[in-house]
């Protein structure tokens, strides 16, 4: 059984190509069953997100399986044959395992180390199982990938260094205030950035949220989603005194928070500090606000320094993650190689027994004078010779099955002995084995 991944992502294809091979929830069920019904596909899973569409599969015939998937993506996406070689990547065996493990760990994402992808991998796998389109190998592959993704985040802390502006603003607020529980936050704006900011505020346990927007209706929609309160911009001056934190992300072309307003607010607060986070471009908050006693102003440039530092930390964590992934790949390869080895051993024994039976029948036809007891003795002798001849190859094959290149030894043995192992003797399939290649390069 061979495993593979065929896909395209934000690095390999522009959005106008990616959107052609995207799937709605309803389409995924149809697509999975169409794939599963194609010749050469034993199990499959489709991972479809904003930045990638990937088809993971297992096949007993690599050539048939790859042909089927190529036909599927070209038909579904209404793409031309030249698009496949231009925009798609194909990984098999070791490289396929590594790819999924890195994807689940957030190392192949647009935002290094992001956490959302692990949930998307889990959802894709669960959908494949629910549609009865997975198989034993795909099950083990994805289950281990999910485990690897969790392990990478737990052991490296790669997701503990925020690199989005909205998250960084909330994270900074938590750090300077020593936590957000019991605090009141005001958010200006009701766009995408505000939605993300509110999500992070809720996750950090902020006590009260006030959302201000020019359109109160939009603010009310957001307030319902987070248990907050909606107000108009006209009310900001009177309500700001309640807030410990203000995060502003409007689309205004002028300052919406001015020094004079903040001076009045701070007088009413009795000097109790307020932390301002301006994540808008152009800026929403007059820089002179920072001159008002008790205020602390962070604009997008100040937060970018934090993001740059955190991104450097994530890169360090990613290097640690690659070591974990390499270990997990070797573990999975040992298991996968054992699946190749067992049929090879069975095929080798069958080949030996076939030769034994054929030659034994031929010999006994010429030795008709032998008694039944003597014929049994000759048969036992033939069996003993076959078993002893096969003992060393089988023992060594079992030993090498635990190595990353175990499949290579299995395939060599199949070719040397012309073994009939269904679905495993592949023509024109090039498989790379890093451990073998490294030794060859050193030699």
From Swiss-Prot:
Pathway participation: Porphyrin-containing compound metabolism; protoporphyrin-IX biosynthesis; 5-aminolevulinate from L-glutamyl-tRNA(Glu): step 1/2
Gene Ontology BP annotations: protoporphyrinogen IX biosynthetic process from glutamate
PROSITE patterns: GLUTR
Presence of the UniProt keyword Nucleotide-binding in the record: no
EC top class, as a word: oxidoreductase
Matching Gene3D superfamilies: Glutamyl-tRNA reductase, N-terminal domain (3.30.460.30), NAD(P)-binding Rossmann-like Domain (3.40.50.720)
InterPro entries: 4pyrrol_synth_GluRdtase, 4pyrrol_synth_GluRdtase_dimer, 4pyrrol_synth_GluRdtase_N, GluRdtase_CS, GluRdtase_dimer_dom_sf, GluRdtase_N_sf, NAD(P)-bd_dom_sf, Shikm_DH/Glu-tRNA_Rdtase
Transmembrane segments: none
Disulfide bonds: none
Keywords, comma-separated and alphabetical: NADP, Oxidoreductase, Porphyrin biosynthesis
Residues the record lists as binding substrate: 49-52, 109, 114-116, 120
Annotated site residues (Important for activity) in this chain: 99
Record GO terms (molecular function): glutamyl-tRNA reductase activity; NADP binding
Keyword flag NADP: yes
Additional remark text: During catalysis, the active site Cys acts as a nucleophile attacking the alpha-carbonyl group of tRNA-bound glutamate with the formation of a thioester intermediate between enzyme and glutamate, and the concomitant release of tRNA(Glu). The thioester intermediate is finally reduced by direct hydride transfer from NADPH, to form the product GSA.
Domains as described in the record: Possesses an unusual extended V-shaped dimeric structure with each monomer consisting of three distinct domains arranged along a curved 'spinal' alpha-helix. The N-terminal catalytic domain specifically recognizes the glutamate moiety of the substrate. The second domain is the NADPH-binding domain, and the third C-terminal domain is responsible for dimerization.
Family: Belongs to the glutamyl-tRNA reductase family.
Function, as annotated: Catalyzes the NADPH-dependent reduction of glutamyl-tRNA(Glu) to glutamate 1-semialdehyde (GSA).
NCBIfam families listed in its UniProt record: hemA, PRK00045.1-3
Classification via HAMAP family: Glu_tRNA_reductase
Protein name, per record: Glutamyl-tRNA reductase
Gene: hemA
């Amino acid at each position: 059984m061979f495993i593979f991944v065929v896909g395209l992502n934000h690095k390999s294809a522009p959005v106008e190509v990616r959107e052609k091979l995207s799937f709605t929830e309803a389409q995924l069920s149809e697509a999975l069953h169409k794939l599963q019904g194609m010749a050469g596909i034993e199990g499959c899973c489709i991972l479809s997100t904003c930045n990638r569409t990937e088809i993971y599969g297992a096949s007993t015939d690599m050539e048939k399986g790859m042909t089927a998937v190529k036909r599927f993506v070209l038909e579904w996406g209404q793409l031309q044959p030249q698009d496949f070689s231009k925009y798609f990547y194909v990984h098999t065996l070791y490289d396929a395992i590594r790819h999924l493990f890195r994807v689940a760990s957030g190392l192949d994402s647009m935002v290094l180390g992001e956490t959302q992808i692990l949930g998307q991998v889990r959802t894709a796998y669960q959908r494949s199982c629910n549609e009865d389109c997975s198989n034993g190998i795909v099950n083990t592959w994805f289950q281990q990938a999910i485990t690897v993704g969790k392990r990478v985040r737990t052991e490296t802390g790669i997701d503990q260094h925020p690199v989005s502006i909205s998250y960084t603003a909330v994270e900074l607020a938590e750090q300077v205030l020593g936590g957000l529980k019991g605090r009141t936050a005001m958010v200006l704006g009701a766009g995408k950035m505000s939605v993300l900011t509110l999500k992070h505020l809720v996750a950090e346990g902020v006590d009260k949220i006030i959302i201000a927007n020019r359109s109160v209706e939009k603010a009310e929609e957001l307030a319902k989603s987070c248990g907050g309160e909606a107000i108009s911009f006209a009310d900001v001056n009177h309500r700001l005194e309640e807030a410990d934190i203000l995060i502003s992300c409007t689309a205004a072309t002028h300052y919406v928070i001015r020094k004079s307003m903040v001076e009045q607010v701070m007088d009413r607060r009795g000097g109790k500090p307020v932390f301002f986070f301006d994540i808008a471009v152009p800026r929403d908050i007059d820089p002179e606000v920072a001159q008002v006693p008790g205020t602390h102003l962070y604009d997008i440039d100040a937060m970018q320094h934090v993001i740059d530092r955190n991104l450097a930390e994530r890169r360090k964590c990613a290097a640690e993650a690659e070591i974990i992934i390499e270990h997990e790949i070797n573990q999975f390869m040992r298991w996968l190689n054992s699946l190749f080895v067992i049929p090879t051993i069975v095929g080798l024994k069958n080949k030996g027994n076939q030769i034994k039976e054929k030659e034994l029948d031929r010999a006994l036809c010429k030795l008709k004078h032998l008694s039944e007891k003597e014929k049994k003795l000759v048969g036992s002798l033939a069996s003993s010779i076959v078993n002893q001849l096969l003992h060393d190859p089988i023992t060594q094959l079992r030993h090498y099955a635990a190595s990353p290149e175990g499949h290579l030894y299995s395939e060599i043995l199949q070719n040397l002995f012309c073994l009939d192992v269904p679905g495993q003797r592949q023509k024109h399939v090039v498989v790379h084995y890093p451990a073998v290649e490294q030794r060859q390069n050193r030699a």
